A protein has these predicted regions:
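Positively charged, solvent-exposed patches that mediate nucleic-acid binding
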Residues: 1-122
């Protein structure tokens, strides 16, 4: 498998944003775009070797099963397309309630549309 191809497994620890301070930094210092069922906050990381993803899904979206599914769909969209990003960045995706019940293709289309509109893809 090529070095830049998506792996078959999920995102590793180094590819996820977990700390509250990182989420706050993106919210205050990062750029923001609202499109479709997603809100994207991002901050470019010059010199970083990989991009990282954080996902926020509130209880307004649905119960725990729905929220977990939405998180999986967003992480998978990022995993498949992370090598298409123009440069490494921290990206936080906030799911809006309209995402509940959507199929993977719809979520992926909104994800790519958001990144494309923000100029984050190669």
């Amino acid at each position: 498998m090529a070095a830049d191809a998506p792996s078959r497994r999920g995102l590793g620890r180094g590819s996820r944003i977990k700390q509250g301070r990182d989420f706050r930094k993106l919210r205050t210092a990062g750029q923001r775009m609202v499109r479709g069922c997603l809100i994207a906050n991002w901050l470019h990381l010059p010199g970083a070797e990989r991009s990282r993803l954080g996902v926020v899904v509130s209880k307004k979206v649905g119960g725990s099963v729905v929220r977990s599914r939405v998180k999986r769909l967003l992480r998978e969209s990022f995993r498949l397309h992370q090598y298409e990003l123009a440069q490494p960045l921290d990206l936080v995706l906030v799911a809006r309630p309209s995402i509940a019940g959507r199929k993977f293709a719809d979520v992926e289309r909104d994800f790519l549309g958001t990144l494309r509109a923000a100029g984050l893809l190669k």
